[in-house]
Amino acid sequence: MIFARYAVTLALCASTSTAFVAPKNAGHGVQVVASSERVVSPLMTSTLSKPETETSEPSVMRPPINLKWDKIAEQLVNVFGYSQTEVDMYAGEVDNSKETLMNIYKALQLNRGFENACNQQYMQGKIRGFMHLDNGQESIPALLDYAIKNGDKKYSYYREHTHALASGVDGGAIMAELFMKETGTCKGAGGSMHIFDKPTYFQGGWALVSEQLPYAAGAAKSILLDRKLGISDNEKYEKHDVAPPSDDDRISVVFVGEGGAQNGRTAELLNSAAKDNLPLLLVVIDNGRAINTYTGDVATNGAVYQQGIHYGVPGLLVDGQDAADVAKGGKAVIDYVRSGKGPAILQVHTYRFNGHSPADPEHERGRKEEKAWARVEQDPIKIFEDKYTANGVFTEDELKEMKKQVLADVKAMVKFADESPMPPVELAKQLEYPDAPDTDYNLKPAPAFADAVNARTISPEQMATVTAHIEMLRNKAKAGDISIGDAINLAIHEEMLRDPTTTIHAEDLQAGSSYDIPKLTQQTYGQIRAADEIIDEGHFIGKALGEGMNGYRPIVELMNTNFGIFGMAELSSAGNTYATTGGQFDMPMTIVGAGGTAPNQSLGAEHSQPFHAYVMGIPGLKICTAASPAAAYGITKSMIRDNGPCFLFAPVKMMKEAKGTVDLDVCAPLNKAALLHKASDASVAGGKAVTVLTYLHGVKEAQLVTDEIMAEGFDIDLIELRSLKPLDMDTIRKSLERTHKVAILDESTLTGGVGATISARISEELFDLLDAPVRRLCMDDAPVPYASSMEVAVVKRGSDLVKGVFDLITKKY
């Protein structure tokens, strides 16, 4: 893709002393040469300017940019490559159409009226929690209403009421959601910050600043996947074997504030969008306030629309107080993305008339004064009214009548919400998982289109290669010679062939990563389904979330599960999505990787963290472990078929050494533990048996000392906790009914660890079965040292289990 337009990319910067050179033949690898001075566009001087001292602070910290249409048109010609004739066409479609101008005005009034009603209802206590209003920024949803289509994917942040309205989401349902009512968009499960609507592809409503950016990239990727695989959504929004139309021009639109755009996720988004030529539009809502802090106080780059230059992503700046100009310029940028030329940025300079939320005291420097000034001087509705009554397009009576109609609609929305019922209490638990914990994944049918899609996307040579690879692994599995990593790889290939909507993301994917988990996936399914990713787990977990919301089944392989720390926000939202959306959006996602802490691991603290314990508190996640090839294979297959997010932890030091047979073509349950060794009846009768609960490397440690325990006349029920969440209390109960004593060999810390949770549940639910306190053998709270001489004090092993069992039986504990 050629961006010759960057040859003149900022003729607009000519007035600055900073040199800016971009080669005429610049594509995604565009090179930028600049002096040591920072590049500042004169278009952005009001955004970036700061007062020299507190005493010299002007009455308006952020003056209007007064960016007229001729300058916007100049950007479209110089940066986006439009001809002047094309630019004039975009202007004419708005300026010469009274109907279009009427629709823009109605959208402005609808969004203002809706937000005012929300504020009133909030003050009356009918809307609860956090709420963030959009007053003053109405030109942006008006653009949505004008130029965005129903099939486009829309991702917003927590200030999204108006974006949902403009996307066609029913206003009564939005208001009902804010009222916590069952008729709300998400049945009252989401609230103000989490508006979702599947029929209009309005996909949030995300509460963590900038988290929505990689999700939107994943949604854009799903559009490319549809086109590549030749599948599309049916009337139930499920994939079927009908190719998107030849003129499919869907895009993904994502909104972020200029403060949120300083987040590193923006750079990752631009890189990903440019690399894959995603049909993605980044809309930057530039109100000059990062929450309420003046953005210039915390960020040196207010010209977010220029951030894409280094990636070959063009940007446009518009004045958000002129709704007609926003519609003209915004439509041109949207059409640029629709045409397949790649991603783009639209920055809208605007003012927010309200505080961050209704409860905000707004103590930040200059905020109250700016707000009062902007309401008088920079109201986009008043500016529109003055402009189009002065030039005779509308009479005051016409405007009043349109406003009256819109406010009547808003009143009806409030009435609908107020009269709607509250959701039933049992709905909360029903929304925990899309698939019940006891689901039999063997009964889930494969997509009917699998063979057809495989035939048109995998060449005969590729199919022959992967078939031979699968057969080789299956023979190893039958012979008991397959490793954990290879067993997972086998399951992944079988599932990717069974269901072509399955995708995979990983670092070093082409090379098979560290344990061959994604081996041969890109060589077989191509880069569109098997993506090598940048070194940021949060980014590609986020992209997987966006794919999962849009009909795909992403797999994420973590080279080491501890690297998932970079993706905690995305993991949290993956777990919450099904419930938060009121059950509208399934969230299939399989995360798999090697982790845990083995004795004598010698990897140091960062690679030895109990990440499985960290994610235990995330609602909606199913968390499993696998210490054998059989468990790894069966669990992986089930997770890929599950409609919710699942996380499989495998033991890092056993990935290649542990070998065994596999029950081929069988999905394992995701809610069951496994009894690996059963104590003899004689030991149970003599009170010399103990239930041992463990997982990951603890399984091997326990197996290594079982003979030693038995040699002393004792015995154990050895239970592998293959499901940490949900926890299999039935298997634990059945064992304790025999042994009445339990030891937990735990690969997590004393405080907040897995063993702490299990111990608490046993004490609460099975206390009457215990003859002794629960014996926890867990990691110390200290970081895991590199040196083995110190590590022994932190990480428990087989010898600790022997002592723990002996102490329980001899009543020394």
Describe every region a protein language model picked out.
Residues 40-140, 354-356, 361-525, 770-813:
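Conserved acidic/glycine
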Residues 116-120, 124-277, 296-305, 310-312, ...:
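Cofactor-binding active-site loop characterized by glycine-rich and histidine/acidic residues
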Residues 595-644:
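Internal gly/pro-rich beta-alpha loop/helix module
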Residues 2-49:
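N-terminal chloroplast transit peptides
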Residues 142, 201-422, 503, 516, 520, ...:
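Thiamine diphosphate
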